[in-house]
Every structure is written in C-alpha cells, then in structure tokens.
C-alpha cells in the first residue's frame, strides 16, 4: 500500500491527508482548482516536504517527520508534469535514455512500442506536437524503472485532438504495466477511461476515497459536480450484439440489461458504463410500446432536493449498483416517490456512446 498521513500549510490552505492507496491500477486524484491535488503529488514525489507526518511506499519509508526525507532521485517515483519538460538539445532517444537506471534494450523497446514513438527517436522536441512530447515525457519517466508513477494533469495543456491522440496510449499503459499510477485530473472523462480508484480533495481535505464506481456514485461526490453533469457508473459485461442493428447488449450483475450504441469489441473484462442523470426518466409501472430501449428495475434509495429547489436528485438502487436521475418536484409528488418504492428507470440507448464506456483494469 501507499501509506499517506501528512499535513502541509500552503498559504491559506492546509493540506491534510490520511489514507492508504493500493499499489496497483490507477488512482485518480480529483478536485476543483486549488483543492490541493498538485500539492499532494509534489509531497509524494519529494518535490516539497510535509510539515509533519509519514509517507511509505510498500516497505520503503519515504518520509517521517524529523527523521527520514528521501530526496526525489532516491524515491524511485516517476513524475509526468502538465508540460513535457523535455531537454531541447537532446533527441527523443537522448531524452528517453536520460536517467535510465539500467540500459536494458528489452525495457527500452517495450516502452517505445507501448507509446508508439518508434519513428520519433531521431527527432528533437521542437519538431514534436504536444501529444508527441507528452508521450516522450511518459516514456522517460517509465525508463527510470520507477516503483510508482505520478501524473499531474498530463492532458491539461493539450487541445482536444491531441487529448484524443494521447488517451489511448494512457489506457494501454494502465492495462499493460503492473505499475501503480497516481493520476491528477479535474476531467471526469479522463478518470472514467483510466482510473480504478478515486480520491476526492476539497480545500486540502480528503472527502472520499475508494473504488472508482463507489466514489463516483457517492453522496460525497454529488456536491462537487454541476447539476447538469451529474452521472452514474454502472458495472456490466458484454452479452452479445444485435443481429440487425448497430447496438450491443450488456448484462448487469442484478439481471438488468443495457443496450448501448455501437458494436463494442468482444472482451471478457468488466465494463464501466457512464449514464448522465439527465438522460434517465422513471415510471412506477412497466411502460408499453416505448421507443426507449432500456428499462431497469430498481428501488428508490434516496431523494435529494437541489439547492435551488427546482430539481430532485433521485438515487436508485440496482442491486449493488446505483443510478442517479434528475426529476422535478412535480414528478416526485405525482408519482409519490419515496425511499424503498419499486420503480423502473428508462434510458435511451443512443445516449450511451463508446466515450461513456471503459474497461475495468
């Protein structure tokens, strides 16, 4: 485990985090600007020093107040910043090999292949696109043979086409490398595609931490997501494809099924499916003759009025999964919706695209 129990005064912000993170998969650190995300990873990487506390990575003690403070180069932690920070006078090959602990051709070839940078090795940073620079920066960090990788919003400085270019490489790294990654982001799109676990910071304090789906659907997460962007993550597996239409059928653990747009590639892995709360409607009886392809049976768990009183955020239990729906107070009163009541949730199949679906690692 990555054990963190630290405090740091940062101007008016006091960062205080006490938690354990798994040494496998991708842990996303999420929060608004100024929440302390970058400050936390700087403390983990040794770029800044806590005022008190302790940090350990597995059996290695990285920091203990007044007794141990390993410098960054001794922590065996790779760091990828928002900007690539490549050496302009080195070629891509020179940047990659700078700082390599062991000159092993096998590791070099594997990293270069995973990142798709074989054809860039002789070029210089000034000739690379933003996405290419970040791929080289990631490769350089990996070739130091780290025990953990810190990534501080590596897509933040890129435009949308470059983000789309780089994201598949990050997905491949997350799936192929047996290396824990702490990934800072304020983008839920990135977190959906990459993360297995999630830690939420607010004003320097941790307000939620755990498996991605659990935190994403939690009440703690709800206040930090704009009302119109509230969504749920459901777990499902591919069952089959429709023989006549470009749609794929997914099966949930509770027996409900989901039809989603597109012919998804076969996989035995569990999928994470994002559903926007504004795309969910509810009814108390099974509808007949509807164009809506998805009808999920569940029970009302909780109802939360929005701050302005214009909407109700309805949480629906679907076995172990949970689904958010935005409804009006009128609908709540007319349908007599209360906790424990059995209902049907309707979701149009066309609202879930491949950008809303990701494999669990």
Swiss-Prot record:
PROSITE patterns reported for this sequence: ABC_TRANSPORTER_1, ABC_TRANSPORTER_2, MODC, MOP
Protein localization: Cell inner membrane
Membrane topology: Peripheral membrane protein
Main location class: membrane
EC number, as in UniProt: 7.3.2.5
Residues reported to bind ATP: 31-38
Keyword check for Cell inner membrane: yes
Chain's role: Part of the ABC transporter complex ModABC involved in molybdenum import. Responsible for energy coupling to the transport system.
Full protein name: Molybdenum import ATP-binding protein ModC
Species annotation: Shewanella sp. (strain MR-7)
Gene (name only): modC
């Amino acid at each position: 485990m990555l054990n963190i129990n630290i405090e740091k005064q940062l101007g008016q912000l006091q960062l205080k985090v006490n938690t354990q993170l798994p040494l496998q998969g991708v842990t996303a650190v999420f929060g608004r600007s100024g929440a302390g995300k970058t400050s936390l990873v700087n403390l983990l990487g040794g770029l800044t020093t806590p005022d008190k506390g302790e940090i350990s990575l597995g059996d290695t003690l990285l920091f203990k107040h007044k007794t141990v403070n390993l410098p960054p180069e001794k922590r065996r932690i790779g760091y990828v910043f928002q900007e690539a920070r490549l050496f302009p006078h080195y070629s891509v090959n020179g940047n990659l090999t700078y700082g390599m602990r062991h000159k092993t051709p096998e590791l070099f070839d594997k990293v270069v292949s995973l990142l798709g940078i074989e054809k860039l090795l002789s070029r210089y940073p000034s000739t690379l696109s933003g996405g290419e620079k970040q791929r080289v920066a990631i490769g350089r960090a990996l070739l130091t043979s780290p025990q953990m990788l810190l990534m501080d919003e590596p897509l933040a400085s890129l435009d949308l086409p470059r983000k789309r270019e780089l994201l598949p490489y990050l997905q491949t790294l997350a799936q192929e490398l047996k290396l824990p990654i702490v990934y800072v982001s304020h983008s839920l799109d990135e977190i959906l595609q990459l993360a297995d676990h999630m830690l939420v910071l607010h004003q320097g304090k941790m307000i939620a931490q755990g498996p991605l789906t659990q935190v994403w659907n939690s009440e703690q997460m709800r206040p930090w997501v704009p009302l119109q962007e509230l969504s749920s993550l459901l777990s499902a597996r591919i069952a089959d494809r429709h023989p006549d239409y470009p749609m794929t059928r997914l099966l949930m653990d509770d027996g409900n099924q989901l039809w989603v747009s597109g012919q998804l590639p076969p996989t035995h892995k569990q999928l994470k499916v994002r559903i926007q709360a504004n795309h969910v409607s509810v009814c108390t009886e099974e509808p007949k003759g509807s164009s809506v392809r998805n009808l999920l049976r569940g029970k009302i768990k909780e109802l939360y009025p929005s701050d302005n009183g214009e909407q109700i955020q309805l949480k629906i239990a679907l076995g172990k999964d949970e689904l958010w729906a935005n409804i009006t107070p009128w609908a709540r009163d007319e349908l007599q919706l209360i906790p424990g009541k059995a209902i049907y949730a309707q979701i149009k199949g066309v609202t879930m695209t491949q950008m809303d679906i990701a494999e669990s690692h």
